[in-house]
Amino acid sequence: MGKSHGYRSRTRYMFQRDFRKHGAVHMSTYLKIYKVGDIVDIKANGSIQKGMPHKFYQGKTGVVYNVTKSSVGVIINKMVGNRYLEKRLNLRVEHIKHSKCRQEFLERVKANAAKRAEAKAQGVAVQLKRQPAQPRESRIVSTEGNVPQTLAPVPYETFI
């Protein structure tokens, strides 16, 4: 018996709804605003078949290039062979969500702007570069009432 290679083949678990998340789509999904240039994640909603992406694009991140009343155009870079092709997808809003990939960066930009303004008001230089975790500070262990013990491995013995 031959194998079927349909458009939604092998998506039994990929497109299923989460536990206790079945039913109608929440209104907040439709009230989100998408603008050209926004970064979005593709996550297909199995209860809405219209405007659903192919299984390859599940979990991919792209940039919005077009917005219509019922769908959003997204540009994805797809690796084909040894090159990337720009793929343009037209997806319904149920199948995308705003990406959090730039969230930490934008928060850091705001924090740096606040630090820079505060330093300028005080007239001091400010360090804005992130520093890697430094080694722990040195400590002194007292041996008073705490005699060091010499440890040795237990010899391996076999009794057969």
Swiss-Prot record:
Its main location: cytoplasm. There is a cross-link at K32 (Glycyl lysine isopeptide (Lys-Gly) (interchain with G-Cter in ubiquitin)). GO terms for biological process: cytoplasmic translation. It is found in: Cytoplasm. Coiled coil: none annotated. It comes from the Eukaryota. GO terms for molecular function: structural constituent of ribosome. Component of the large ribosomal subunit (LSU). Mature yeast ribosomes consist of a small (40S) and a large (60S) subunit. The 40S small subunit contains 1 molecule of ribosomal RNA (18S rRNA) and 33 different proteins (encoded by 57 genes). The large 60S subunit contains 3 rRNA molecules (25S, 5.8S and 5S rRNA) and 46 different proteins (encoded by 81 genes). Component of the ribosome, a large ribonucleoprotein complex responsible for the synthesis of proteins in the cell. The small ribosomal subunit (SSU) binds messenger RNAs (mRNAs) and translates the encoded message by selecting cognate aminoacyl-transfer RNA (tRNA) molecules. The large subunit (LSU) contains the ribosomal catalytic site termed the peptidyl transferase center (PTC), which catalyzes the formation of peptide bonds, thereby polymerizing the amino acids delivered by tRNAs into a polypeptide chain. Belongs to the eukaryotic ribosomal protein eL21 family. This is Large ribosomal subunit protein eL21B. It comes from Saccharomyces cerevisiae (strain ATCC 204508 / S288c). The lineage of its organism: Eukaryota, Fungi, Dikarya, Ascomycota, Saccharomycotina.
